[in-house]
UniProtKB/Swiss-Prot annotation:
The gene is Pou6f2. Residues 607-666 bind DNA. It is found in: Nucleus. Expressed in kidney, heart, muscle, spleen and ovary, but not in lung. SUPFAM superfamilies: Homeodomain-like, lambda repressor-like DNA-binding domains. One of its GO terms (molecular function) is DNA-binding transcription factor activity. Residues 17-28 have a biased composition (Basic and acidic residues). PROSITE patterns: HOMEOBOX_2, POU_1, POU_2, POU_3. Keywords: DNA-binding, Homeobox, Nucleus, Transcription, Transcription regulation. This is POU domain, class 6, transcription factor 2. Residues 1-61, 188-297, 435-461, 670-691 are annotated as: Disordered.
Amino acid sequence: MIAGQVSKPLLSVRSEMNAELRGEDKAATSDSELNEPLLAPAESNDSEDTPSKLFGARGNTVLPDPGTPDQHQACQTHPTFPVGPQPLLTAQQLASAVAGVMPGGPPALNQPILIPFNMAGQLGGQQGLVLTLPTANLTNIQGLVAAAAAGGIMTLPLQNLQATSSLNSQLQQLQQLQLQQQQQQQQQQQQQQQQQQQPPPPPTSQHPQPASQAPPQSQPTPPHQPPPASQQLPAPPAQLEQATQPQQHQPHSHPQNQTQNQPSPTQQSSSPPQKPSPSPGHSLPSPLTPPNPLQLVNNPLASQAAAAAAAMGSIASSQAFGNALSSLQGVTGQLVTNAQGQIIGTIPLMPNPGPSSQAASGTQGLQVQPITPQLLTNAQGQIIATVIGNQILPVINTQGITLSPIKPGQQLHQSSQTSVGQAGTQGNLLHLAHGQAATSHSPVRQASSSSSSSSSSSALSVGQLVSNPQTAAGEVDGVNLEEIREFAKAFKIRRLSLGLTQTQVGQALSATEGPAYSQSAICRHTILRSHFFLPQEAQENTIASSLTAKLNPGLLYPARFEKLDITPKSAQKIKPVLERWMAEAEARHRAGMQNLTEFIGSEPSKKRKRRTSFTPQALEILNAHFEKNTHPSGQEMTEIAEKLNYDREVVRVWFCNKRQALKNTIKRLKQHEPTSAAPLEPLADSPEENC
C-alpha cells in the first residue's frame, strides 16, 4: 500500500506536461485513438487540466517524428500502455479513493491518507507498502526538504525495501526488470545516435501505412531517460516490458515480414487480453505491476489503486531525492499498528549491506531487512510476541511473572526531529520507524555483531543456543553447550534402561535434593522457553537481566532438563546432581530391583474420591431446597441426606457448588447489564455455618 499526501503543486506539474504534449497531439492520426484509456473518462479532453486528467492514459502521447531531433530530446515520451495510470495523484483523488475504506467518512487533506493495495480482484494477492507523511508540509521533514524544489512530489527509493519476507522474491524480480531497462536504454541510445548520423530509410521499402506507425516499425523506440521529477516521472516496469517487446523482434526479421506477421506496437498495447506479452518478466509476479484493466472497470476504488501502483513503480527509479536519503539510513525498526492506527509493537530491522541495483544511476537505495525471528514489543517496551516469517506468536504470560519493560534510557541514541515513515500490510500494518515514535526500538546495532553478550545468551535455553549455528559449538557463560546436550541425551537413555519414568525421578530428587527438583518443577516451563524462540541477536543486556531478576529462582532450575529447556547456568548447576543420582540408581539396580525401589521410594497415592451422580428426582428435591434457602443449616442438610440416601458430605458439597455457580451467573449478568436493578443479596459461605 502507499499512503501519503501529495500537495497541490502537482496540478501545475501536470499542466506543464500537458502543455508540452499538446503540440504533438496534433500530428496524431486516427490510429492513435486505439490507445484511449480504459480507466479514464471517455469525454476527457487534452485542453482541460482538471484533476481527473491525472488518471489519463499514456496512449495519448504520440511517438515523435524522427526528423525532429530537437523535440525528441526536449520531451521524452513513453510507449503506449493499456492500463493508462499516471504516476501523479492529487490529494483530492486520494481522499475520494479511500472514502469507503477509512472509518469516519472521508479524511481531511491534512491527515495521512492510506490506499490499500491488497483488495478484491487482481490486487488481492499483492503485498504492498504504506508511506504515511506525519505532516502536511513536506518541508518540515528533515532530510526531505528537496520536496519543495521538486514541486511537492515526494519520492523514495523502494526498489530494495524488504518489509516482509513475502516481498523479497517480488522485489528481486523488479530489480531484474530495472536492470533490463537500463541495458535496453543503452542499446537504444546507441541505435539512435547511428540513425541521427545516417538518413532514415525511404518509406517505399515498406508497405503503405499511416505515418504515426512508420517510425516504431522502421526504427527503435526512443530511449527512456529518467527526466527530472518536476517534469515527468519514469514509466512503471510493465510499460518497460511492452516498450522493449517490439525491439526484441526487429533485428531478426525483415521489415516486410514484420509488417505482415507482427502487429504494430500500438495494436499490441491496445489488445493485451487477446495476445499477452511473450516477455519472460511479464509472467512473473511483481507488486508494482498494474492489474488487468478489464477486471477493474466496474471497481473505481481498485482502478485508482492500480494508478497508485503505477505511481509506486515510477517512484522506484526516481532521482528527485537521491541526495537527501542519508538520514533514512538510520531506520532501526518497524512499528506494528492495528486497523485503527494504534501502535501495538515494534519489530527490529537491520541494514542490508548488499549492493543496490540502482547504484549506477546514482539513486541511493534504502536497504533494510527484518531479523527472523523478530522480537515484538508493545508501546511500553514489553515483549508481547515473536514474529517468525508471516506468523505472529503471542506471548503467553505465566501467572505471577511479569515482563520487564525496556527503559527509555536503555534505547539506542536516535537522531532528533526525524520523520516517521510507515510500511504496512492489510490487517496489521508494519511501519518503518526512524523517529520519535519508536520509543521501544530493539538494538539492531547489536544484531549486526556476530556474538552477543553472555547475559543475553544466558536468557535463552540450551536447546535454543544449540540450534543456533553461531553458539552451537561454543561456550556461554563458561558452560559447554555440547557437553550439556550429550549429557541430557545419555541421561534419558540411562533412565529408560532402568525402567524409570520422569515422575519417579522427580519424586526421588524431591525427597533427596528438595522441592526444586520435583516433577512439577521439572515439567514447569519458564517464561519464553518452550512457547517462543527469542532471537539471540534481538536480545539486550537489560532485557535479560531484568527478566532473570524478576523470575523466581526456583523456576530457573527446572524446565525439563532432557529437552534442554533450561538456561546454561541452571543446566550447569543441575548436571552434577543428576549425575550423582543416576550413578547411585544404577548401583542399586545392579544390586537388585528391590534396592532400586527402596532408593526411589514412592509417595502415598492420594486416592481421588468417586464422582457422585445424582438422579433427576434427587436434583429436583435439592433445587427446591436451594430455592427456599441457599444456606441450609447442618440439621437441614442431615435431613436432606437421609431423605435422598446420600452422605451428608455429598449434600454439603452440592450446596457449595450450587452457590458458587449462582455467583458466577450473577457476575456474568452484571457485566452485560451494568445498570441493573437492586443488587442481589451477596452469597457467601461462612466457615462458622455449614461448610
